[in-house]
């Protein structure tokens, strides 16, 4: 609907330009927003205030001319001028009903992407295989997964890339420890964190062990078969730990999505040579660097992107440049989205700039850093165990399920044990994910089990329960929610408000895909659940006073249920038929 209004405004602007009211050459970004107060219409635009100055008119005068120049459209019942010159558009209720009818008849709820379909690479999760996945990996994994799901739903081709840290000097230390204890390695590797700490302790305390670790790094980098065998064994065990976490979280990541740092090893000398051939390299204290004028420190000195150390070793930037070239030139990506901590913003700004300057990425490939904030404890500090250690992600999920189990059993002690466990898993894991996804991506947030497992407020339990309320209506009828289709005829205020919000699902998903912000979908679903609750309490469905009204309200309920279910699934949550 917003696109329709933008087109109508653009036609009016063209007409006023042709009539000499507006000067030629204006290309304003036409903004159309949803109104909060529906007595002021469904949509509003400030275009008259934006263009009043170049038109040499007062905003309200220009607004009057715009309204007069607007073409008639069946989806708009009327346009009013409010305040200093806002244009308020009222949606035609018949046109709204037709949009809902289309949504009900379509398994994709009438949602289509506006604009061309694209190939999108999503870089997400990317844990360091030297350690077990911890809470710091949660945000990249689930935010990236949610955005990837939305992109796919809109029709884009999505290529997930799990850029795991499977290479580097720390692996020499781990291989040395693995080599020392071949018999007990399997059992010790069951706890990667403990294995890493033990190897680090040996490295710090034994000069001979440290020398052996450094030697193994050199041999590993040289491709010595026995070192590669130990390295591959360690990585296989570490990756199996990661896959267990992904399956518990319900994210769409598989071993096929892994392309770690080591995959680019053979390309790194060529990356450095290509930068040299382009005249971009400068030697600084023995290291090979790229200096770009647009990146300077507080003293005004250029900042380096170091691509090769004085000793010949390569850095993260070198590997990132190789991956950017691969994703643009080989995977043919139109967009590459990097779901990586906000603290890496400068690193990505600089490597993106180098990649473009060097010609590693096509001009039409968009490189986008989707940075995120930190997950903190209740005290506002980085989330840690009581003894100050790192919290394993699998331990966090275990506790979430245990707490959810106690909560669900307390409310429904009569449920069979298997069903209790299933509900607890969906509620517990869903609560952890939703508490994160519902926050703005770039914000820090405090982790709090009590708040996230509450049935009140913008939480997973509240939304999961909202869906079960809709499902219960159709269970009482003995009908499936997906069987219901037709054209609703919303009349009452609560019906119209619910209908208008349902029609905005596609627009919300478009914004999530464009901006990489899942919290927009969370806010929409929370609002939708609240509107349904008001509708349910004020507009009887099964006891409606006429068959036509009952059918119309059933259609609204069905579309609400399907939209909630689809939205929850796009966030990576499991909808439940009953709780």
From Swiss-Prot:
Cystine connections: none
Q: Which SUPFAM superfamilies match?
A: Anticodon-binding domain of a subclass of class I aminoacyl-tRNA synthetases, Arginyl-tRNA synthetase (ArgRS), N-terminal 'additional' domain, Nucleotidylyl transferase
**Which UniProt keyword terms apply here?**
Aminoacyl-tRNA synthetase, ATP-binding, Cytoplasm, Ligase, Nucleotide-binding, Protein biosynthesis
**Which terms in the GO cellular component ontology are assigned?**
cytoplasm
List the PROSITE patterns hit by this protein, alphabetically.
AA_TRNA_LIGASE_I (PS00178)
The compartments listed are: Cytoplasm
Classification via CDD domains: ArgRS_core
Q: Name one GO molecular function term.
A: ATP binding
What EC number is given for this enzyme? 6.1.1.19
Return any one Pfam family short name. Answer: Arg_tRNA_synt_N
* Entry's Gene Ontology BP terms: arginyl-tRNA aminoacylation
Kindly give the InterPro entries that the UniProt entry links to this protein.
aa-tRNA-synth_I_CS, Arg-tRNA-ligase, Arg-tRNA-synth_N, Arg-tRNA-synth_N_sf, ArgRS_core, DALR_anticod-bd, Rossmann-like_a/b/a_fold, tRNAsynth_Ia_anticodon-bd
What EC class does the entry list? ligase
The family assignment reads: Belongs to the class-I aminoacyl-tRNA synthetase family.
Its subunit composition reads: Monomer.
Protein name (database record): Arginine--tRNA ligase
- What's the source species for this entry? Azotobacter vinelandii (strain DJ / ATCC BAA-1303)
